[in-house]
Amino acid sequence: MNKFNSQTYFDLIAHCLPDPEFEYKEVVKILLDCYQNKGIVFTMGCGGSASTATHFAADLAKTCGGFKAISLVDNIPLVSAYTNDEGWERVFEGQLENWITENDVLVGFSVHGGNDKWSGNLTKAMQLAKKRGSKIIGFSGFDGGAMKKLADACIVVPTDSEIYGTPVVEAMHVVITHGLVFDLKKVINNERKT
């Protein structure tokens, strides 16, 4: 029997809006610093969060104009080669080894915050970014997981719903990234006018 109810889902979405001071301003600051220093924003995620990572990188590059943004999930031959040759846990870390610097930002999306069972590959990439002096932004849910501890700023969607947790967290991540893009575009356009 399907226990999913769309009205309950929508009610949970409305209830799970994070507090207005939920590190959002810090995320904007980190991304603007990266833009101004001509760094690269690398995004990553597994499962549904992979599509959010790609969507956010595309929005930064196109909508905000001038952002260098790359989704680490998009090069399927490279993702497949790392998975086949070195294991799934190295898929993001391996890609970053040749690229990430102190001017760059790594953005991770994970419903459970980089839980080893589902997405330990995200935390491995974050550990490399930290060693390189890069800033790290996390988007997670539930209690934030390992990502909350590793990130310089982590937006956590508070939920404890077993049935609705994943769709609520994933939906809120997309909503929040759209807000970030709107705010970043406004600041960048104002800077260009001066």
Regions found by a protein language model. Give the residues of each.
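Generic N-terminal amphipathic, Lys/Arg-enriched alpha-helix
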Residues: 1-19
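A short, well-structured juxtamembrane/interface segment
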Residues: 18-37
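C-terminal binding/interaction regions
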Residues: 103-138, 142-157
